[in-house]
Amino acid sequence: TITVIVNFSFLENTMSSTRVIEKISKPEGKLFKLKPMNNEQNIGFNYSYLFFNHNINPKIDDGFIYILPYKKEAQMFVEELSYLGSTYSNKEEPKGWKSYSFTSEEVQKIFPVRKGIVIDVVRDYNVDTTKLFTYYNKMNSVKIEHNDGTIALYSGFNKDEIYVRVGDVVYPKYNTLGNTEVYDARKKHRINFSLFYYSTKNDIKLSSLSKNNQTEIIYITPTFYQNGESIKLKKDFFYES
């Protein structure tokens, strides 16, 4: 989803607002329409526009229950990841920071946690299994946007075994995103997962947005369905899907 803001510096023969905000998810089509006050005269206008490659300030479904991202009856070990920006570059931890690492002794098929549209795929990296890594950020990944504007990031795929493309609609337990790969000399399989959305900073209204540094990422701690219950994942536990 792209957020588009159109600013009119001059309008003639129309009652349109001088600032129009639209959120679009299709590659082409009509953005909006100006209607004349007098059908016998032309509409006059001058405009400029901004666009942001995100759905900013979406209406989040706080009660949504997510599905664990691996096949039924499989078990994976859950760890919580620290925010590396604070450790290595003095960046402030994002609001709500939460990122999980699901690990396994064997390759796992990874599925989406809810229905969504694939918006980004990275399949550029090979793994070095001769070393041990404290952290590893060069990971093949899939990013999926959901219909409430949240975005899920899955990282840790075998670059030759990612099965989706940008624009694909994917469903939990039905569409395999890809297969995990070992990430260092410990020979464990890992998939990292986080859920987030984009928001304006400091309660700035969307209608007042003028540049990218006025937005921020806010992370969500998802609720998952597991064994007939709705749960928050605890670190250092095995969970069966």
Model-predicted segments: where are they?
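Surface-exposed loop/edge segments in extracytoplasmic proteins
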Residues: 13-19, 151
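Short, acidic/hydrophobic/Gly-rich beta-strand patch recurrent on exposed beta strands
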Residues: 100-101, 141-147
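Short acidic, flexible loop segments centered on an aromatic residue
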Residues: 1-14
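Surface-exposed, glycine-biased beta-strand/turn segments
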Residues: 20-138, 226-241
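Acidic, glycine-rich catalytic/binding loops that coordinate metals and/or anionic ligands
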Residues: 61-66, 72, 162-168, 175, ...
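Short histidine-centered loop motifs in beta-beta connectors
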Residues: 105, 111, 146-174
